[in-house]
Amino acid sequence: MVAHLKNPGMFTSVSAFAPITNPVAVPWGEKAFAGYLGSVEAGKDYDATELVKNYSGPKPAILIDQGTADGFLHNQLKPENFAAAAAKAGYPCSVRMQPLYDHSYYMISSFLRDHIQHHATALGLRNM
């Protein structure tokens, strides 16, 4: 998501599984940005929620799948922050909350086909 939002027009489609969508607002991001970039403020350039607020390029719909049983959901991933920022910016985004899935292989393997279809459709390919 960050690669797309920092490089308008480079990507035709975008999707993610359980992404850290607002790292400047969570402990993982605060620690990483302060340690690697010198400040949390510098991390805004690598935060999808911050980037979508001012994005002005092409807007391919973003598909996000997130498990409701993911132990990182509420204190680290924050998909609701991204969804709200995207909606306010008029950016099409679908955040699908998947009941009982966590942050594991089974989450990805269960919904990978949907993500492949999302990209195939964006590329104008027939249904996979």
Ranges and model annotations:
Residues 1-128:
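Non-catalytic cap/lid and distal C-terminal segments of serine-dependent acyl enzymes
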